[in-house]
Amino acid sequence: MNNAAGTNGAGAEVAPLIELRDVVFSYAGHTVVDGVSLQVDRGELVALLGPNGCGKTTIMRLINGLELADAGAYLFDGHVINATFLKDSVASQRFHQRVGFVFQNADAQLFCATVGEEVAFGPAQMGLSTDELKCRVRDAMELFQVSDLVDASPYQLSGGQKKRVALAAVVSMNPDILVLDEPTNGLDEDSCDIVVSFLLAYVAAGKTVLMSTHHQDLVRRLGARAIYIDRYHHVVEASVPSYGTESAAAE
């Protein structure tokens, strides 16, 4: 993708990596996202919090291009992401390589016969050398401790194992931003520790993370910037200990 105007040159303002401007999205006649605006800069770790039905998952899907806004605008790295943009096969492929999305339910994204094939599928589409592909797959599987499952069927794994495989499959593509819908749901304490350590290292390396969660302790542990979305779709920057009693009642 070409650089957006105004983002190059000494002293030039750099566009946010993610920007939603008054985004509206409806499903089956019901407004799910109503005028939401937010920004995520490069190198940030941002957590979306809020009650069920506030639109967190839909926002994630909009950012990944799985849904398109009915009104408003979504910009990624200064580029408007809309139907016209996504019809450009080259631009669309590059966009989806740069934005890694992990579903809350890992079953929604696992489709290969073995774990090894699952983790290799994404980077295999990137024109990498055989050695680079093998290295990416090996490193991602080791990172999320699923190397011993290389020949296993993803469908026979536990929920926590599936989540770690899904993370490895996305991380193997080395995206610029990880968009994670409830990344620690269904994970035991050890698996949570693996994910937390990875996310901290990922952001320290200059990458970006946007995640949804209901767990305040996870947000505090990660030192994430918290964005709270209430049931009326109001977006509020908030400190984790006081972002609203409404969220405490969620899930």
Give the predicted meaning of each segment.
Residues L49-P51:
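The feature captures the beta-strand-to-loop junction immediately N-terminal to the Walker
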Residues N64:
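Helix-to-loop junction immediately C-terminal to a conserved catalytic motif
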Residues G72-T84, F95:
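Conserved ABC transporter NBD signature motif
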Residues D131-L149:
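Conserved ABC ATPase "signature" region
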Residues S153-L157, Q161:
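Conserved ABC ATPase signature
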Residues L178-D181:
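Catalytic Walker B motif of ABC-type/P-loop ATPase nucleotide-binding domains
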Residues T213-H214:
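H-loop/switch region of ABC-family ATPase nucleotide-binding domains
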